[in-house]
Amino acid sequence: MALKNFNPITPSLRELVQVDKTSLWKGRPLKSLTKGISKTGGRNNQGRITSWHRGGGHKKLYRIIDFKRNKIDISAIVERIEYDPNRTAFIALIKYEDGEYSYILAPQKLSVGDRVISSQDADIKIGNCLPLKFIPTGTTLHNVEMKVGKGGQIARSAGTSVDLVGKDSGYAQIKLRSGEFRLVPLDCKATIGSISNPDQKNINLGKAGRNRWLGWRPHVRGVAMNPVDHPHGGGEGKTSGGRHPVTPWGFPTKGKKTRKNKRTSKFIVKKRK
């Protein structure tokens, strides 16, 4: 996929950079693989904001993605590559030999007409899904399971992938894009290749309104608030906050480590950079 630049006939077009989607499917998604999705506005079941700066945005249908790839030893053909408003990666509609349809995350270089399969005997080919114990070291992977049968959780965002760097004592060692080395059970499944749409990181929305279409509201700085709203608020004139950066609740931010899951720390061989 290439990037699109625009002639600056309006101010918002001057900086706009978008991913060229001309090769994607232009129709509607397969109705049987979609469902409605309700907006939360960043609120939880008590009506309190738990995710700030969310709200509004264009109405969307949720595409049901097969992260588990549980249809074993049944080949499927790629019918089309589609845009998905719920994620940064593109998705592929595949049709199995028994007639069933499914959506999967589209890896780079997967084309219409290609065949994919989930099997321990599958070839090491883009889009095929295998248990890690049958994948050779050095292979680039995406949609990697962390728990057997739970479905892929690692490397699902646009352009991402992990590298299989070793196998030992029932675990595979994978290298994440963050620089982290992690252990994953060898019976967990992963898909060959890296995720589509690697140019997502180079886009420029061009104007605030386009962010609103995506469901993001304005991010107000703490120093622009009143003292009642934020520890950085208040002061005469424009002040810098007068203390080290903190959250609205007074906890250190901007680099403070927040990970607290000691139970799974034993699976992290090397921490992220």
Swiss-Prot record:
Region (Disordered) location: 228-273
SUPFAM superfamilies, sorted: Nucleic acid-binding proteins, Translation proteins SH3-like domain
> Pfam families given for it?
Ribosomal_L2, Ribosomal_L2_C
UniProt keyword annotation of rRNA-binding present: yes
A GO cellular component annotated for this chain's UniProt record is:
large ribosomal subunit
Q: Can you tell which superkingdom this protein's organism belongs to?
A: Bacteria
What GO molecular functions are on record for this protein? rRNA binding; structural constituent of ribosome; transferase activity
Assembly notes: Part of the 50S ribosomal subunit. Forms a bridge to the 30S subunit in the 70S ribosome.
Q: Please state which protein family the record places this protein in.
A: Belongs to the universal ribosomal protein uL2 family.
**Name of the protein in question:** Large ribosomal subunit protein uL2
